[in-house]
Amino acid sequence: MIAIIDYGSGNLASVEKALHGVVTSDPYKIDMADKIVFPGAGSFSAAVSGIKNIRDIIIEKIRNGTPYLGICLGLEILFSESEEGPGTGLSFFNERLKRFKKGIHMGWNTVEFNDNIIFSGIKKGEYFYFVHRYYAPLGSYTCGKTFFNGYFTSFININNIYAVQFHPEKSGEPGLKLLRNFGELA
């Protein structure tokens, strides 16, 4: 079962439809999940607040090897903190998310990614849909980057953690392929 984290915001319906997952904030269902998806929309602080009762089980599941896919805010919540506001994320990466100096990154853009199972069958140069104002700087966790006012991290994969800054559920066939690839992980 794929648990799609319900933190009181986010684009849950299209992710649920694409992955045939279960939208939940129930710690028991999350604990029983084979995979976890944290879809993204909303603010860092609101997400931190929205997961306060399930934060520990999410961290435990990820640490124990459960495949995790973070989408947009689901990538951002992996970090310690954000310029967006107060609160402590899941802290898998001890970095502070930054705010773009010039507006919001909204629209279609490419991802320069290393070969990875999650991008299997997706051509380099494909476009994905982005909408975000905050970003993860480049770091040792960066497996894919995108250019908007400079390069930022748009794809992370370390062990069982997969995270994308774009919205695959809004990115047409390449995005749906990425979601299928995640769903097919052993």
Curated annotation (Swiss-Prot):
State which Enzyme Commission number(s) the record gives. Answer: 4.3.2.10, 3.5.1.2
Its chief place of residence is cytoplasm
The protein's location, in the record's own words, is: Cytoplasm
> InterPro entries in the record, alphabetically?
Class_I_gatase-like, GATASE, Imidazole-glycPsynth_HisH
| Active site residues of this protein | 72, 167, 169
Q: Name one GO molecular function term.
A: imidazoleglycerol-phosphate synthase activity
Query: What region holds the Glutamine amidotransferase type-1 domain?
Result: 1-186
The keyword ATP-binding is annotated on this UniProt entry: no
Q: Does the keyword NADP apply?
A: no
Q: Which reaction does it catalyse?
A: 5-[(5-phospho-1-deoxy-D-ribulos-1-ylimino)methylamino]-1-(5-phospho-beta-D-ribosyl)imidazole-4-carboxamide + L-glutamine = D-erythro-1-(imidazol-4-yl)glycerol 3-phosphate + 5-amino-1-(5-phospho-beta-D-ribosyl)imidazole-4-carboxamide + L-glutamate + H(+); L-glutamine + H2O = L-glutamate + NH4(+)
Q: What's the protein name?
A: Imidazole glycerol phosphate synthase subunit HisH
* UniProt lineage: Archaea, Methanobacteriati, Thermoplasmatota, Thermoplasmata, Thermoplasmatales
Q: What gene makes this protein? A: hisH
